[in-house]
Structures are given as structure tokens and as C-alpha cells.
Regions:
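The ATP-binding site of the protein kinase catalytic domain
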Residues: 9, 17-31, 36, 201, ...
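Generic structural signal for buried aliphatic residues
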Residues: 295, 303, 403-405, 467, ...
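Repeat-associated, polar segments at repeat-unit boundaries in modular proteins
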Residues: 305, 313-315, 319-329, 339
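Solvent-exposed serine/threonine-rich low-complexity stretches and specific carbohydrate-binding patches
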Residues: 289-292, 326-327
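Polar, low-complexity export/assembly segments characteristic of proteins
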Residues: 18, 25, 29-32, 36, ...
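Amphipathic alpha-helical polymerization modules
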Residues: 1-152, 527-631
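Amphipathic alpha-helical coiled-coil/heptad-repeat segments
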Residues: 94-284, 290, 298, 303, ...
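Signature of Asx- and small-polar-rich beta-strand/turn repeats characteristic
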Residues: 279, 293-294, 299, 307, ...
């Protein structure tokens, strides 16, 4: 059937076609101006959805590659640089220690070495204050706190060191009195004229050297005993609990006079039952304790069970020791009581003497059989001197057992290591109450020797990929570094002062001004100084010979740490290369998906424009034609 086509229909159709052409022209113009295939999701939903996914992935890659990996690289480079500097300092110090070990040092050599050691002693730790974007790089999660104190300060810190018996060493103490200060003005006074070579001697003493020197000291020993404590922890055989003597052998705890058995099943009334068997073969002593009760075994030994289930066996014999076992008592509905024990026991050792300075008397207090049970605290040098019996007791511990020392330090110098990065610490600031200090590293007290997880900082540098960027202070900056250098400095200074005093007395003798009693006094003093300087030189050489190996260990550790950082840098570089490749690939995918082809667009737009112009010409004819033109 034929259809009638009117002029109006022709005009409308022509206008619609022209509008379609114009719409296409607008679309191509927008694509050409924006260089994108679409300007709104409705233009092409497939392209839009794909664009969202590709751009999301690309944004993540940009974050990993341009930000995270660059930050990680900066952190690692700064860490490596600091370790490199530290290693160089350690090698230089090792060289000076080797010189001291050789013994052939002139006065000028000694002065130069003393000056250099003094400089290095402060510099060794200051390199550990390196920062990355304001964050301290060696202090774990405490990136807002420097590794060392940046200025002198006075503030009380209560520090608990958790060590093992490898920290017990033996040092040689030389008794020279005040001979180093002899001069022309005082050699004949009563304080100096009595010096002879027979008063000069040296002997070895065992000690635990603490992390710091110049510790707090009170004139009242009761105050010192309240703040300065020494104890050790050891494994316990808990089924049943056995105690066998005055030391810990790794599996059981011993008292001097008894073997002790504690029945976890308790007596008929649910109380803890104890059996003390004397080691002299006497009849066993069996008894039960209620919570809060104390039983005296003999004049020296007693046992207490407190309300919290803590069992304390105290012995005042040889050497003094208090052994504490933590147990938990539980009573069921039937009234039966059982006890559960911790697998570690704490034994306290009494510190017998306290000295403010490293005097001859302080070292003599632990020397010899008469002082075999003594423990002496020296605040100036930060040492616990051990009598022979105490040394043997602690030496018998397993390497896995913990020796715990608590002490206070209030006077801090620039470049002292901040203890909050190493130990359980209570900090008593001006703004805190005396019974409410700031507490750091509390979790260390719950772990043998304070072995808690390192505070590792990692950066995300890829999908499900991260890299460790930080190195913790304990991996390279140990307290022993500075303490060892300080000891060499002190020994060298003592030797140097005795050499100078010897030269002074020798020049007085050679001056010809003195005769008779004064000359005899000078000759005796010269003999004493000669023996003293020989002993001091021998002690210095012996100590430095041992430190050569120790400092080799320090440099090796620094090298290993630097190698570890370098390996992480190498891994990061590989990841960065991969991220760079991924970034390029995804940028191309995004471009292919979103970006328009300019050449193709130009051709299409030119074609559309020609079509549009032609359409305008034809439509103009249609629009001016009416029905009358056909009549």
C-alpha cells in the first residue's frame, strides 16, 4: 500500500538527520578536545567500568612506587650511611686499642689516644640519632624519641637490666692509692711519705658491669637496698615441685641444707604440704601451711605461703638467698585445693656493701675467702662486684637463666643512650607523682631475659608485599661499646698519671736538692711508683688485648647489620623496577582504554563536517519547498 509523503514529513526527517549529524560532530569535537573516548559513563559503560578498575590499580601502583618505595629507600639509605659511619668509628677505636695493647706508648702517644678516645666515646652513639623525615630511625616504634639524650639532664630513671651469666667477667684492680698525685709540695707529708712498693698490688675480682656508670647512691644503706636489687630466675621442675640446694642448676632450685618437696595435692584440709629433708641425713620435716602462714625450719631457714599463692623459702646461710615460687591455689566445690606453679622461680641475692666511688676498699670488700659471699655495688663505675661464692653460684646457672638487676640513675649526659629503648624503665618526671612513674617496656619483665619481639617497621610496597625499613638500636648500638672505650680511657689515664708521677719523683731525686730522710722517702716512692706503673701498664695491655677480639666482634656485627640493610635495599630496587614496569603497562592499558586516537578523530570530524555542510545545502532546498510548488 502506498504511503503519502508530505513536505512537512520531509522537513522533519531532514532536521532529525541534521541534528544526528550535529550530535556526532559534537561528540567527536568533545573527544578531540578532551582526548578521551568518553566524557560520561553513559557514553560507553564498558569503557567506564574498565577505566575504574584500571585506574584503581594504577593509583595503588603509583602509591607503592612513587611514595612508599621512595620513603623506604630514603630510610634504608640513611640507615646504611649511619651504620657505615659507626663502623668507621669502631675501626678507628680498634686501632687505638691495638696501640694500647702493644705497650710502647710515649707521653705524646698517650695524650693523643686519650683525646681521640674521648671524642669517639661521645661520637659512637650520636650517629644513631639519624632521622628520616623527622623520625628517629633506630628507635623502633618510638620514632619521636632520639636514641640518646641530646643534652644533659637530671631526672630519675629506675632501670631493670635482664642479663645472663655471660655478663659476668673478671677484671684486674691495681691498688696504688693516691700515688699519682705525688709532687714536690706533698711528697714528705704524712699522706704520701709512707708509700712503699709493698703497698702496691693487684688482684682479680669478678663483676657484673651495668649498662651505665655514675649511678644513684645514698648515704643510707637502707635506701640503697630498697632501690638496688639483684636476683636471678631459673627453670623449675613443677611436677612435683622440687627444691634441692642454694643454687639453680636449670631444672630444680636448691637450698644449702635441705632437699625440699612440695605436694601439689595438698593435705587433707587442702593446704600446701612441704617436706624438708636435711642433707645431713636427719629425719625429714613435714608440715602444711595455710595461706599467709610462715614455718621456721631452723635458725637459718623458713618458708612462707602468702595469700596469693607465692611460696618464699628464705635462707640466711652461705651465700644469702631468697627463693620465690609463684603458685596459684584453686579450691573446687568439694573443698579440694590444688596448686599450679609457674615454670620459673626468682631468687634474690643480698647486696652487702655500697660504695659511691671505685675505691680500693670497694674492690677489697669482695676479695679473698673472708669476703666470698659479699656483693658490692659501686655507683661511680656502675659495677656489681661479686665474691667468689656468689660468682660460682651465678656461674652455675644455665645460659638460658636470667640475672636481673634494678638500680636508679638520675644524672644524664649528652649522648648517653636512653634506657627506654633497651630496658624495663620507670621514669619519674617532675609532672608525675612519686608512685606513678611513666613505665616503658613492661612486657620485658614477663619474658626470660626480656626477649620480646622487635619493634619492626614495614612499608607496603606492593600488593601483599612489604619490606622492613628500620634497624633497631640493639642490633648495633650496645652499651658495651661505650663502656669498653670508657674503661680503656680510665686505664690509660691511670697509667699516664702514674708515669707522670714517676717522672716527677725521678726529677726530684736527680735535682740534688734532697738528702737524708727526704731522699729515702723519694726513693721508696719511686720504687712504689715504678711497681704501680708496671702493674697499670700490664693491666692496660691485658685489657686491651682482650678488647681487640671484642671490638672485632663489634665491627663484624656492624658489617653484618649493614649487609642486612644492603640486602633489603637490593630487594627494594628489584621491586621498584617491577613497579616501574607495572606502572608503564597499566598507564598504557588506561590510555588504550580511555584515550582517543587523534588522527582518527580528525579524519572523522572532517568527514562529519563535510557531511554536515552538504546536509545543510540539501535541507535548505527541502525547507523552502512547499506544496504549492507542486500544484
Amino acid at each position: 500500500m502506498a504511503m503519502r509523503i508530505t513536505t512537512k514529513m520531509m522537513q522533519n526527517t531532514s532536521l532529525n538527520n541534521l541534528n544526528t549529524n550535529k550530535t556526532l560532530q559534537e561528540k567527536l569535537t568533545n573527544q578531540l578536545s578532551t582526548m578521551k573516548k568518553i566524557t560520561r559513563p553513559s557514553d560507553d559503560p564498558v569503557i567506564a567500568i574498565r577505566s575504574l578498575k584500571l585506574n584503581s590499580t594504577l593509583n595503588k601502583i603509583d602509591q607503592y612506587y612513587e611514595k612508599n618505595s621512595n620513603d623506604a629507600q630514603s630510610w634504608l639509605e640513611l640507615t646504611e650511611s649511619a651504620i657505615k659511619t659507626t663502623n668507621a668509628i669502631l675501626e678507628d677505636m680498634s686501632g687505638y686499642i691495638t696501640q694500647c695493647a702493644q705497650g710502647s706508648l710515649t707521653a705524646e702517644d698517650r695524650a693523643a689516644i686519650l683525646q681521640n678516645l674521648s671524642n669517639y666515646q661521645s661520637e659512637i652513639y650520636s650517629t644513631g640519632n639519624a632521622t628520616s623525615a623527622g623520625r628517629s630511625i633506630f628507635t623502633g616504634y618510638r620514632t619521636d624519641t632520639s636514641l640518646t639524650f641530646l643534652k644533659d639532664k637530671t631526672e630519675r630513671y629506675s632501670i631493670t637490666e635482664q642479663r645472663d651469666n655471660s655478663y659476668i667477667d673478671t677484671i684486674t684492680h691495681t691498688v696504688v692509692g693516691d700515688m699519682a698525685n705525688i709532687n714536690a709540695g706533698n711528697f714528705s707529708t704524712a699522706s704520701y711519705s709512707a708509700y712503699t712498693e709493698y703497698q702496691v698490688k693487684s688482684y682479680d675480682v669478678a663483676r657484673i658491669r651495668l649498662a651505665y656508670n655514675n649511678l644513684d647512691y645514698a648515704t643510707d644503706d637502707a635506701v640503697n637496698k630498697n632501690k638496688i636489687k639483684l636476683s636471678y630466675f631459673s627453670d623449675v621442675d613443677t611436677s612435683p615441685v622440687k627444691m634441692n640446694g642454694a643454687y639453680v642448676d636449670g631444672a630444680s632450685i636448691n637450698t644449702t641444707s635441705y632437699s625440699v618437696f612440695m605436694n601439689q595435692g595438698a593435705d587433707a584440709n587442702g593446704n600446701m604440704q612441704f617436706t624438708f629433708t636435711p642433707k645431713d641425713g636427719s629425719a625429714p620435716i613435714t608440715f602444711a601451711l595455710t595461706a599467709g602462714a610462715t614455718q621456721t625450719i631452723d635458725a637459718n631457714t623458713s618458708v612462707t605461703l602468702d595469700a596469693d599463692g607465692v611460696i618464699t623459702i628464705t635462707e640466711n646461710g652461705n651465700p644469702p638467698v631468697t627463693t620465690t615460687l609463684q603458685s596459684t591455689a584453686q579450691t573446687d566445690a568439694a573443698g579440694n585445693t590444688t596448686f599450679a606453679f609457674a615454670d620459673r622461680a626468682q631468687s634474690s641475692l643480698e647486696i652487702t656493701d655500697f660504695s659511691k666511688t671505685a675505691s680500693d676498699d670497694a674492690y677489697a670488700s669482695v676479695y679473698g675467702d673472708d669476703n666470698a659471699n659479699n656483693i658490692t655495688y659501686i655507683a661511680e663505675t656502675g659495677e656489681l662486684l661479686l665474691g667468689k661464692n656468689v660468682q660460682n653460684k651465678l656461674a652455675a646457672l644455665s645460659i638460658n637463666d636470667e640475672i636481673r638487676i634494678t638500680y636508679d640513675k638520675s644524672e644524664w649526659k649528652t649522648d648517653d643512650l636512653d634506657p627506654v629503648h633497651y630496658f624495663y624503665t620507670e621514669r619519674y618526671t617532675d609532672t608525675r607523682k612519686a608512685d606513678d612513674p611513666l613505665v616503658y617496656n613492661e612486657e620485658k619483665l614477663t619474658k626470660p631475659k626480656g626477649n620480646v619481639a622487635k619493634q619492626i617497621i614495614e612499608y607496603d610496597i606492593g600488593s601483599n608485599q612489604s619490606i622492613r625499613v628500620n634497624t633497631t638500636a640493639d642490633e648495633i648500638y650496645t652499651h658495651n661499646m661505650g663502656r669498653d672505650v670508657g674503661e680503656v680511657y680510665d686505664l690509660l689515664e691511670e697509667y699516664d698519671s702514674l708515669e707522670k708521677a714517676y717522672s716527677t719523683v725521678e726529677s726530684l731525686i736527680n735535682s740534688g736538692k734532697y738528702e737524708g730522710t727526704e731522699l729515702d722517702t723519694l726513693n721508696k716512692q719511686l720504687d712504689a711508683l715504678n711497681k704501680g706503673r708496671s702493674l697499670a701498664k700490664s693491666t692496660l695491655q691485658k685489657r686491651c688485648e682482650g678488647l681487640q677480639t671484642i671490638f672485632k666482634g663489634y665491627t663484624n656485627q656492624a658489617t653484618l647489620t649493614r649487609t642486612d640493610v644492603g640486602s633489603r635495599e637490593s630487594r627494594l630496587e628489584l621491586i621498584q623496577n617491577r613497579l616501574s614496569s607495572q606502572q608503564t603497562n597499566f598507564e598504557e592499558l588506561v590510555s588504550d582504554n580511555e584515550d582517543a586516537d587523534v588522527t582518527e578523530l580528525a579524519i572523522q570530524l572532517n568527514s562529519v563536517e563535510l557531511t554536515y555542510q552538504a546536509a545543510l545545502s540539501s535541507i535548505s532546498y527541502v525547507m523552502k519547498t512547499t506544496l504549492l510548488d507542486f500544484i
